[in-house]
């Protein structure tokens, strides 16, 4: 059995300010207000993007408004990190308008988020910019989970963002599922399976250097859609050059009457490309969503993922 991740809910001090942006779906006002209150409780100095409360259909503003907030977050000199408030949908729309020279000219500051934000994390990695796959900031403003243990895990996951920024956390537990068990070293990439698969064939296609450790997670998708997305994503990259595939949580993904488990389905694809498969990484849309450094070289060995 794999060990549990650290349940430490202690927030580490964050030097400088954190820029809060909403590059994807719109945010409920009450959730935003609760999030800002909790950031203040944890002593986080923040800058709120000008358009985070904007609405355009189901999005947090127009493409132009969301791009303006993202670029401004990198223009300000005292920003330590850029934390996305919510995922959902919309990040792919921003890619054609991103000024990479402008972003690269800023002092290093990671972009933080998951779910649809995975699209931006991959693009940042492609352009040599730091990123963190981890909870979005509005996780702080959500109503507590009914199960005390799950609420503790959520709070520990949110705190893991500050711990990673402080350079404290350096590993997460995993469990081997199939393929060889040799030591694997490569760049940590991936994120939300559906979001990344949807970008195949576009300028936002997954950046997957040889030897990469591909992390995958998802939420609310039936098995056939997950298999379709997996096939599409693997066909869009040189999948045989991956170092490993590591599964996070697949939350509320109904099996219904499917004969095979999700692990068996993923196992078939991993075996076909001769890539080792791991699972139980505490990453995804469940209560456990520990932060990890996107694009950083990591090592899979035994039941640990270290960076």
From Swiss-Prot:
InterPro entries: Carboxypeptidase_A_C_sf, Class_I_gatase-like, LdcA_N, Peptidase_S66_N, Peptidase_S66C, S66_fam
Record GO biological process: cell wall organization; peptidoglycan biosynthetic process; peptidoglycan turnover; proteolysis; regulation of cell shape
Gene3D superfamilies registered for this protein in UniProt: Class I glutamine amidotransferase-like, LD-carboxypeptidase A C-terminal domain-like
Enzyme nomenclature, EC number: 3.4.17.13
Annotated active site: 115, 217, 285
GO cellular component: cytosol
Keywords from the named record: Carboxypeptidase, Cell shape, Cell wall biogenesis/degradation, Cytoplasm, Hydrolase, Peptidoglycan synthesis, Protease, Serine protease
GO molecular function: muramoyltetrapeptide carboxypeptidase activity; serine-type peptidase activity
Major site of localization recorded for this protein: cytoplasm
Location in or out of the cell: Cytoplasm
Record-linked CDD domains: Peptidase_S66
Catalytic activity of the protein: N-acetyl-D-glucosaminyl-N-acetylmuramoyl-L-alanyl-meso-2,6-diaminoheptanedioyl-D-alanine + H2O = N-acetyl-D-glucosaminyl-N-acetylmuramoyl-L-alanyl-meso-2,6-diaminoheptanedioate + D-alanine
Annotated pathway: Cell wall biogenesis; peptidoglycan recycling
Subunit structure: Homodimer.
Entry function: Releases the terminal D-alanine residue from the cytoplasmic disaccharide-tetrapeptide GlcNAc-MurNAc-L-Ala-gamma-D-Glu-meso-Dap-D-Ala, which is a murein turnover product. Probably also act on free tetrapetide. May be involved in murein recycling.
Family stated for the protein in its record: Belongs to the peptidase S66 family.
Name assigned to this protein: Murein tetrapeptide carboxypeptidase
Organism: Pseudomonas aeruginosa (strain ATCC 15692 / DSM 22644 / CIP 104116 / JCM 14847 / LMG 12228 / 1C / PRS 101 / PAO1)
Upper lineage: Bacteria, Pseudomonadati, Pseudomonadota, Gammaproteobacteria, Pseudomonadales
């Amino acid at each position: 059995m794999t060990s549990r991740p650290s349940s430490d809910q202690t927030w580490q001090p964050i030097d400088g300010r954190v820029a809060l942006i909403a590059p994807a779906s719109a945010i409920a006002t009450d959730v935003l207000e609760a999030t800002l209150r909790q950031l203040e409780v944890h002593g986080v100095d923040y800058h709120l993007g000008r358009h985070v409360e904007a609405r355009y259909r189901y999005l947090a503003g127009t493409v132009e408004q969301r791009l303006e907030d993202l670029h401004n977050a990198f223009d300000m000199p005292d920003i330590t990190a850029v934390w996305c408030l919510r995922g959902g949908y919309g990040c792919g729309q921003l890619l054609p308008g991103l000024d990479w020279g402008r972003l690269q000219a800023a002092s290093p500051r990671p972009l933080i988020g998951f779910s649809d934000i995975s699209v931006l994390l991959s693009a940042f990695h492609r352009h040599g910019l730091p990123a963190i796959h981890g909870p979005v900031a509005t996780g702080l403003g959500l109503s507590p989970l009914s199960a005390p243990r799950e609420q503790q895990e959520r709070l520990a996951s949110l705190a893991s963002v500050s711990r990673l920024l402080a350079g404290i956390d350096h590993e997460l537990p995993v469990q081997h599922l199939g393929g060889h068990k040799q030591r694997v070293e490569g760049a940590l990439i991936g994120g939300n399976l559906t979001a990344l698969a949807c970008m195949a064939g576009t300028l936002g296609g997954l950046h997957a250097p040889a030897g990469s450790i591909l992390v995958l997670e998802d939420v609310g998708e039936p098995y056939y859609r997950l298999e379709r997305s997996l096939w599409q994503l693997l066909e869009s990259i040189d999948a045989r050059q991956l170092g490993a595939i590591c599964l996070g949580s697949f939350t509320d993904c109904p099996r219904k009457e499917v004969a095979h488990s999700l692990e068996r389905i993923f196992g078939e694809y991993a075996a076909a490309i001769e890539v080792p498969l791991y699972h139980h990484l505490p990453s995804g849309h469940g209560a456990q969503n520990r932060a990890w450094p996107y694009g950083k070289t990591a090592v899979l060995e035994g039941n640990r993922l270290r960076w």
